[in-house]
Structures are given as structure tokens and as C-alpha cells.
Amino acid sequence: MNRNNPNEYEIIDAPYCGCPSDDDVRYPLASDPNAAFQNMNYKEYLQTYDGDYTGSLINPNLSINPRDVLQTGINIVGRILGFLGVPFAGQLVTFYTFLLNQLWPTNDNAVWEAFMAQIEELIDQKISAQVVRNALDDLTGLHDYYEEYLAALEEWLERPNGARANLVTQRFENLHTAFVTRMPSFGTGPGSQRDAVALLTVYAQAANLHLLLLKDAEIYGARWGLQQGQINLYFNAQQERTRIYTNHCVETYNRGLEDVRGTNTESWLNYHRFRREMTLMAMDLVALFPFYNVRQYPNGANPQLTREIYTDPIVYNPPANQGICRRWGNNPYNTFSELENAFIRPPHLFERLNRLTISRNRYTAPTTNSFLDYWSGHTLQSQHANNPTTYETSYGQITSNTRLFNTTNGARAIDSRARNFGNLYANLYGVSSLNIFPTGVMSEITNAANTCRQDLTTTEELPLENNNFNLLSHVTFLRFNTTQGGPLATLGFVPTYVWTREDVDFTNTITADRITQLPWVKASEIGGGTTVVKGPGFTGGDILRRTDGGAVGTIRANVNAPLTQQYRIRLRYASTTSFVVNLFVNNSAAGFTLPSTMAQNGSLTYESFNTLEVTHTIRFSQSDTTLRLNIFPSISGQEVYVDKLEIVPINPTREAEEDLEDAKKAVASLFTRTRDGLQVNVTDYQVDQAANLVSCLSDEQYGHDKKMLLEAVRAAKRLSRERNLLQDPDFNEINSTEENGWKASNGVTISEGGPFFKGRALQLASARENYPTYIYQKVDASTLKPYTRYKLDGFVQSSQDLEIDLIHHHKVHLVKNVPDNLVSDTYSDGSCSGINRCEEQHQVDVQLDAEDHPKDCCEAAQTHEFSSYIHTGDLNASVDQGIWVVLQVRTTDGYATLGNLELVEVGPLSGESLEREQRDNAKWNEEVGRKRAETDRIYQDAKQAINHLFVDYQDQQLSPEVGMADIIDAQNLIASISDVYSDAVLQIPGINYEMYTELSNRLQQASYLYTSRNVVQNGDFNSGLDSWNATTDTAVQQDGNMHFLVLSHWDAQVSQQFRVQPNCKYVLRVTAKKVGNGDGYVTIQDGAHHRETLTFNACDYDVNGTHVNDNSYITKELVFYPKTEHMWVEVSETEGTFYIDSIEFIETQE
């Protein structure tokens, strides 16, 4: 087929390459479709799946008007609207050919240059010459790449084979890459940003071509040989580019409006023209971008552009004054805001005009007999969509001299005559005659036919599209009367025509063969408290808004399909809060919950809106039907915006086929080409969701397919478990005795049987003050490979302040704040299995498909699926270098529900990544070596100190001379060891954990022996005054690890009674210090009144007449042979302050 020959029709060859024959299509059950599967295993079955083979091309006559860029923009939008009404694959090549011939009619960039010149004139700003050259060069390149792609696509469609598929895939990727690299030249790159407004049309048209291209991967990718993962990447790129392109166009359009805003009539005219022409050239196109989503609109849709277009006011306004006749644009008496308020209506429901009644009045010029009958006012009769009720609106001065125009069948163009009538004393701006096509004529009545006049036609500003583009929907009016410069009076009666697209379905017809769009601005009525607000620029029209519960509005529709047909409902909306809605279809209601989509007081951007499909099905009971939307309960102070309803027809047979196709795609995309392993980018969550899709297949229709797919997906699950380096991924045992299993705090629970996880899920409660909620696990180094990338995958249902850490010789930190926006309206299917996962899976998939996957880490923190990567180094055998997986919530209002956790090997590092890791690893090893040397020194000192505590090598007997001070000295040495924990709060071991643990255990043994041999209970005061009898003016204080008794008054006293072995040798050892005057006493006494006292005073710090530091503790001891079993120890002082670190009374050998 020749793309450039509009009279040539395409002939499709008979099907081949495994496609079904005509007999198979006509008699689908004539032979057993399962026979071929009887002796297959799942790998052989999956190899038979190559995707969808669908394609039929239509070549309509092409219409090109390269001289009028406004006409070009209108033609493109009109053709796209028609294209979107049918399944995408049907006419792609001819459709692309039309677009390229519109934009490059003569293989040069004349149309694109005209796009730029058009806006340059409107905003009175020239684009930089270098920017123009760069843009035109890039456009030429894009055109050439597109031509090459279309040639390859057409050749492949005519006779597909592997070589042609490879060629078209290569050219597709080349064209996609070309768009990505060249789009910055059209207003977003650093060199062109200053000219973004003047480049807006170029940007929008180029973005449109790019988005149309990306959808081809979804239509043809499987047939080209792309893996499902690759197709998903292109799909995600399409969704992300739709967001980027839409937001740029809206922001640039609004900035352009602000740039041309002024204060007078001339500035308002420029503002008005910019608004109109950019709507036709760019913003209408932007509103169609979402409809290129093949997954959401596989069989076409009927997008509706409900926005209004205002042509220029009908007033005498030639390029220059003519004699005494003055052009209206130069007048100083109409302000910008006055004109905007008079000519531009507030947002309102969509309407059609039934009747226009024009009133006429006669104006006679002062001092003469010259007169003119002019349009002084009018009355409009209109009605809302599919609503029989009519209402009237009047403007200007209503008189008995009227001319009636019946516009029920539409008014598509108007020729008008504007006059500036009068003389030096007074003049009038008015309209004297008009011709409404095809409705009728209002003839001119005047006796001064040769006075200043200007004939205006709406088709100059609003070109027709195949004579079927626009309908007159309203007429606004400006009436003014002013006296300026003495007796000169100026009167003005100025109408402005308002237009809507004729292809907007005024009867809201619902069909069974495509998705029906029902914009809420086409409601027949709205509830009290609902307001119509200006659309955000990308919805194609205005939208509805509510700030409290109640009725949103009612849409009246006509069902042009069998009443047995079932449908699903989608609602496109934006909201600052989660809320519940009821959709009433006639008298039956369906309720569902909608999550919030935007922050309070946030602006309405593309990503603020969400399209949610409700799993409940509906059926219309009559052809004339109503759909009423209610919000409850109260949402006071919040904002809800509703854009449109989508009515999605259900074809059971087709949906069953699509379900099988989706299941095949999902399962096939899990495996590598050989079907022996999982693809690296496949997650455990995706395996579970593929299993759900397979489980939902019909046993009757696809029994053998289902059996094979179940076998395959079970194999995938086994492979997923085998590659998962985490132990116990199902959380069967937490805090078990296994060394490397899950360790968790309080507040971690396991849930099972929920709607969002096929397996078990983790729930982390909020932290308690300084105690985080956590769960962690160590992956042993023996299971890891050096210089390899590993990935932690998971799925978060919802979370706030969830911290996910991967710790190796460095830490990778991720915070997830995932909104609770996965709405589940699922219910039990009546079986013992509980949840209806078929319905649940469909709904969750729709929501996840709509979820952005941005590269920005702040935005990525909100996605439900997550991946976190970490690299291993050389796995130094001298250091335990496993990978710690840590999940924790450290805030008191945080929480998390997540599951499908897996740590998998991605592959060996190479190139720059390997070099960077080797450099980082070398630095880390060097730092570890330095720390190890310092730690070894401390370790040896601490080990020697602990050795001195014992008299044997088995640490079973404490040296008699050892006191608490010796134990504390050793403890301080151990405490100075660094890098004991990677995370001190969770006590995750660090590189020095083992030696620290070794020394700490020995010290603990020494402390135990010390406590055991001391017959004085709590002699180190670590338990305060437990076991002691004390007066109220005594206390135990703490300094670091030391606890000490403090007596600060002469009458303070502390004592204790204990038992001993009579007539054995004991040593009383006291470590204390005396501060100030007086003495401190520690006295020991038995039941025979035999007593000994250790005295502490200032003289203790005089050594050979030299005073030493009196802040140090001194140890004194004495030997005592008790005569009785009962003993007493007493502590007192005479004045000053007495500090006692420890009191020991220990039995010793003779």
C-alpha cells in the first residue's frame, strides 16, 4: 500500500503464521480447541503464546490545507476524535499519514514555522533565531524518523515476519529516543525555556505525535517480539510523558495568558485571541492525550470537548480609524475587566441554543435625519443536555421590534455587519444585519448605507471542519454609554458569539460497542451546594465541585443497546479527602469509596485526577435513564472535583478472551525466553497477582489453558522462593532461636487473608515514644557474591514514615509514605475461600496501572511497589559482611502494612558501577583496618584487665584482691570499643560486635562472681538502697556506670544486717572518698560486740606531706574474724560529704 496515494485501498492477505483460519472463526467449536494441549507441559504451552495478531487498514481521502495553521489544528483534533472512536489497531498507518501530511504537507517545516509566527504575533515577542533553527532542525529529524518508522510498520503489517518485526522495533525505539532527546528544543530545555509560550503549539503537536507512537508498543509489542516487561516500560513511559506534556502545556498556556493580560480594550482583544487560538491549536489536543491509553480504552471511546469558543466581539474594529469613524480597539472607555465580565460567561452546565430573538432599536444621528436600526439586545432560549426543560436569558435592551432565529437544528456560521454610525457630536457602535447559516437573515435598515461599516464572518476565526464543526450555543453582550471630551457621546451594543463542538453528544447516548464518556458538565441538573468551576485546562471543559456532602448532579442518558447489556462504571475525579459516593442508576444504588488524590489547597494538576473503575456491574432497566451521584458523609472543609463518568460495556465472551490473554501475558512475562528462570525485574508480588489472574479463568471455557497456566505460575512461585535470599519470607516464625531469622519488636503483627495480599503480610504499629517498631533479618555473607547488585522488592499497601534500610558496608535508606488509596469493595464469593479475588484483582490492577512511577525519590516514596538496590564489595572474610534488611517505624503516628518481601540477586557489577564499588570498598577496607588497629589495642588492654580479675583460665574464680573499682575500670575499657552496632537502637551487630561480646560476657562473669562472694547485699549500690536501712537524708547517685552512696549530714546513717560463717577469715574492703571536714566511717560488728572501723578523711590525700587529688576514690580494707553468725555493717560521718562506691565483706582462705 502506498501511504501517499489517497485513492489506494489496502488489501490484507489471508491469515497465516499460526493465525486461525476462516473456518475456525465461523465455527469456533467445530473441533476440540484443547486437543493440542493434551501432551504439553507448561513451558511448551507458553512457547505457543506470541500475542495478538490484529490489523485492518482503511485509507480515507486526505484533506490538506497548508496555508491556514488554525485549520490544520482543527483538522487534526477532529481526525483524532474520529480515530479514538474505533479500536486503535484498525487504521494506524493511514491515520499517521494524515497527521504527517497535515504537519509537513510539502516535506518542509512551513506549517511549524507558521505555528511559531502565529503566537509571536499574539504575544508580540519574537523567538530567538537560534531557538528557531534548533527547533526546525529537530522537527526535520523527527519527520524523517517518523517516515522511516511508518514505512517499516506498513511493510510489517502487510506481511509480518521476524526480520520485519526487528526492523520496525528498531525504528520505533529510534523514533522514541529522538522524541525524548528533541522535545527540550520546543520550550523545556535551558536554551528554549524563555520562548516556551511562543513554542506552545509546536510543543503540543510534537508531544501528540510522541504519545501516539508510544501506544503502538502496547498494540503491537508482543507481535514484534518484545517481552512484557519491555512493553510495560513503554506503557509507563507513555503515562509519565502524558503527565509531563500535559502539565507543561497547561502551565505554559496559563503563563501566556498572564503575559498578554493588560488593562485596555486592545490588550483584552489580544488576550481573547490567544485564549481562543491556543485552545484550538494546543489545549484541545492536550485534552485527548489520556485517551491514547490502550489498556484503558482498548475498543475506542467518545471523548467530548465541552469547552466553549468565543469569536471576537461583533464591533467596528478595522486595522485603523477611517475619517471620523474610530476603531473600537482604540477606545479608552472599556476596561479589561469590564470586557472580560461582559463577554465571558462564568462556568456553567453544557447547553444547546434553541432560539435567538434579537431586539432592534433605531438610532438617529444628532442634527441630522440619518438613522440606523441596530441590534440592541436579545433573548436566548436554551436547554441542558437531554433535559426537556428550557430557560431564557436576556441581554441588553429588549424591544418589541424583534427578529426570531430558530437554532434547534444548529447555527454553524454567521456573517455580520458592524457599524460605527454617527457624526462629530455622537456615534454608535452596533450591528445592523446578520446572516446565520443555515437559519436565516436579519436585513439592514438604514438611510445612510455608505457610513462606516465592517463585514465580519465567524469562519475567519473559527474555520469549519467538513462543514460540521461548531454550533452557536450562546451570545453574550456588552452595552455601554459614555460621554467623553465634552458633548461627544458614544453608545455601544456589542454581541459576542459563543460556540461549542457539534460532535458533543447532547443526548448522552450509551452504546454496547465502546466506552461512553459522560462529562459531568453535561448534567441535566446539579445539587444545591454543587458549583460548576473552570476546568484545569486538560479536561476539555469545565468540571463540578463540592465542599460538603450531598447531591453532585444528575445525568440523563439514552441507552442505545440491549437492556440485558451489563456495564462497569469509572469516575474521574480529584479530591483532598477520601469519601464515599452513591451512584443511583434510576432507583438502584451502588456505593463505593474513593481515596484522596491531592493535598488540601493544592493546585489541580494532571496527577491530581484519578480514574477509578468500580467492580460492581450495572444494568439499565429502561432506555431513558438517569445517573445521579451523591457524596456522603460530610466532607466539610474539603474539596471534591468530578470530571466525568465512563460507562464501560461488558462483553462476557470478549472479556473471557481478554482475561485469558491477560493471564497469558502476565504469566509469560514472568519467565525468561527459555522459560527456565524468572526475569530479574519480576517481583514476588507480580507472581502472586499473575496467580490470581489465572485462578479467575473459566474452567469450562479454558480448562486446559488454566491447567497449563497454573502449572506455570506455581513453577514461577517456586523459582521466586528459591532465588529469595531472605529466610522465612512468609513470616512463619519471628524471634525464633534461628540465628538469621526475623527479629522483631513489640507492635509487629502478621495478617493473612486480606484483599491486597495473596500470602501473609506484615503490620508495623506506631512507635512508643523512644521505642521504634521494627523487624529485621541478616542475610549471611555465605549466600552472597562479591561485587554483585542485589535488590529488595516489596509491596506496601499503605504506610507513614516506614523506613527501609539495606545495610552492608554502607546503608541504603528508603522512606515510604504510601497513601491508603487502594480501594477494595470486594466481598466474599460465597465459597470457603472468602475473598472474591477475581473482582479484587481487577480493581487493584486498574488503580496500580494509574499509579505513576516517577524517578524523583520524594514522589517515588508514595508508590505501592518498591525496589531498593545495594552492592556488595569484596566480602572481606575478616569481617562478617552480610546484608541486613531492616524495616522500622520510629514516629508515634507512623504505621505500615506490607508484604511480598524478597532480596534477590540482580547480577554482577560491571563498568563504571564496578569501578565505583571497588573504590568505595577499598576506602572502606582502609577505614576498617584503621578502626581494627585501634580496636585491637583497646581489646588487648581490656582483655588484660579482665584476665587480672580471675585466678584461673576458666574464669571460675575471682581474684581476692579484685574490687568493684577493678570491674568498672575493665567495663570502661570495653565501652570504648567502637562499631559494636550498625544500628544502636536495634542493636544490629557491627564489625567489632564479636570481640565486644566476648569481653562483655567475661566481665559479666566477673560481676556475677563478685556479687556472689560479697555477703553484703547490694554492696555496689547498683540497685539503689535495696537491702539497706537508711535515714531519709541519704541517697544513691549515678555517674556513668558507677552508683555510689552519698551521706551529706552528720546524723545520716546507713546499715545492713547479714549472716556469715563464724570463726572464718573475712576481709572488709571499702572504696570511698571523703570531701570536706570530718570523718567518714564504715564499721563492721558481730553479735559478740566485736567491731572494727575503716575511717576516711582529708588525711587520706596527704602522701608524705603532699596533697593529692581529693576527687579520687580510695580503697581500704581490714581483716575480721566474726565470732557469731549475725553481722552488721554501718556507714556514718561527722560532717562534710561521704561518698561510698562499694562495700565488700568477703571470705578468704587462710
Swiss-Prot record:
InterPro entries, alphabetized: Cry1Ac-like_dom-VII, Cry_V, Galactose-bd-like_sf, Pest_crys, Pest_crys_dom-III, Pest_crys_dom_I, Pest_crys_N_sf, Pest_cryst_cen_dom_sf
Source organism: Bacillus thuringiensis subsp. aizawai
Keyword 4Fe-4S listed: no
GO biological process, one term: sporulation resulting in formation of a cellular spore
Function: Promotes colloidosmotic lysis by binding to the midgut epithelial cells of insects.
SUPFAM superfamilies: delta-Endotoxin (insectocide), middle domain (SSF51096), delta-Endotoxin (insectocide), N-terminal domain (SSF56849), Galactose-binding domain-like (SSF49785)
Entry keyword Ribonucleoprotein: no
Sorted UniProt keywords: Sporulation, Toxin, Virulence
Protein name: Pesticidal crystal protein Cry9Ea
